[in-house]
A protein has these predicted regions:
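Short, Lys/Arg-enriched, Trp-marked, Pro/Gly-tolerant hinge/linker segments that flank
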Residues: 1-50, 63-71, 75
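Short Gly/charged-rich anion-binding patches and loops
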Residues: 28, 56, 90
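Terminal helix-turn-helix DNA-binding modules in bacterial transcription factors
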Residues: 40, 44, 63-103, 123-128
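Short, basic interhelical loop/turn and adjoining N-cap
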Residues: 49-56, 99-105
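Short hydrophobic/aromatic patch on the recognition helix
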Residues: 57, 61, 105-106, 110
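Regulatory input/activation interfaces that engage signals or partners
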Residues: 114
Length: 128
């Protein structure tokens, strides 16, 4: 149990990695998602918007940002959610605002990225 708590503490201390891409097409996508994390467009739609193939964009996300498009979008949404959760906003409201179909889908993403549910993450922070 102590090892698990240490892992959770370490993950809370790590900054979210949202590097800026050099490629202008990726830059347009990343900026749009930072401005509106709930934007539902997938890689195919973004490819049409920026004049590239979805395969090219997928390769660029991996080579320039080190993560897939989906993972990067989850990180953006997590970064948008954390201050709101810390302020005590309801998980259901945040989930809807960030484009998740259900609060449980948001909680599942949160758990994958942080190792904890939203409510437990902040409860552990407060008790540490």
């Amino acid at each position: 149990m102590a090892v698990l708590l240490d892992e959770l503490e370490w993950s809370r201390e790590q900054p979210l990695a949202l590097p800026d891409p050099a490629d202008r097409r990726l830059g347009r996508i990343c900026q749009a998602l930072l401005e509106d994390p709930a934007d539902p467009r997938g890689l195919e739609e973004w490819a049409r918007c920026v004049g590239a193939s979805s395969r090219t964009l997928a390769r660029l996300f991996l080579s320039e940002l080190g993560v897939t498009f989906v993972h990067w979008r989850h990180q953006v949404r997590l970064a948008a959610a954390l201050p709101r959760l810390a302020a005590g906003e309801a998980v259901a409201r945040i989930a809807v605002d960030l484009g998740y179909q259900t609060p449980s889908a948001f909680s599942a993403m949160f758990r994958r990225l942080t190792g904890s549910t939203p409510s437990r993450y902040f409860a552990l922070s407060d008790s540490a």
